[in-house]
Amino acid sequence: MKKVWLMGLMLAAASSFADDVASGRAKADVACALCHGPNGIATLPNAPNLAGQSALYLSEQLKAYRSGQRQNAVMGVIAKPLTDGEIAQLSAWYSAIRVTVELP
């Protein structure tokens, strides 16, 4: 019985994460893609790549911008209206992107 309950819990978590990723992608297309690129690879020289970053790291940074603890004129405006749920969704989207590196 415990195994069935645990499997159900894991499936629900996976489904919730998939929903967060999809919602995060939609939000990122509107709020983030201009600077950070449609796939998290920055299009502007001063914007960092977000693809493949840790969800925890991204969430902490967005919350720091939102609270004013971390200062940036653009990011402060972008992050200010974000809810905790939207931050979780954006973080899930960018952390779900797989990045590969080619050595020279």
Task: Name these PLM-found stretches.
Residues A13-S15:
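N-terminal signal peptide c-region/cleavage motif recognized by signal peptidases
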Residues Q61, R70, A79-P104:
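C-terminal capping alpha-helices of c-type cytochrome domains
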